[in-house]
Amino acid sequence: MDGSAHPNPGKGGFAVVELDDDNRVKFCHQEQFEYTTNNEMELRACLYALIYYGHRYHLFVPIVYCDSVYAINTLTNWKNNWKRNGWIKSDKKIPENLTIIQKYDIIEEKGYQIELRKIEGHKGILGNELADALATGRMTEQEVMRKYG
C-alpha cells in the first residue's frame, strides 16, 4: 500500500496492492483526491487495507507492508494514547487526520486487524512500486492487472 500527494499538500492518491506467492497481482485498488496531504493518503491506504483485509481474512491477521513511518507510528504507537487522552496529543493539540484515525480505531474495535510492517519505499519492492504507481496516478488499476495480474 502507498499514499502520495504532489505537491504536498496537493493532488494525491492512495493504493493497495495484493500479490500472490508468484508475485502476480491478485487485487489492486486506487483512489485519487484533488487536494490532500501525503500523510492523509498514507493513513487512508491503511484504513482501506484494514477494511478490505480485515473483512476478507478474518481468521488470521494479514501483514500489510507500508513505507510510511508516520502511518505506522500513528496507528500502532500513538493512537491508543491519544484516545486515552480524549484524542489529544501530548502537546495538547488535536492530531492531524483525526477522523481517519478514529475510523481506523472503530473498525479495529469491531475485531478487524492487520499487522503493519515497515518497508523501504522506492527500493524496487514490486508491491510497493505498483502501489506507488497507482497512488501517484502513473498507472491505472486496469493497467496493473493487465501487466502484472
What are the residue ranges of the model-derived segments?
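Short, conserved alpha-helix that lines the donor NDP-sugar binding/gating region
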Residues: 42, 46
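RNase H-like nuclease fold core
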Residues: 1-41, 51-55, 133, 137-143, ...
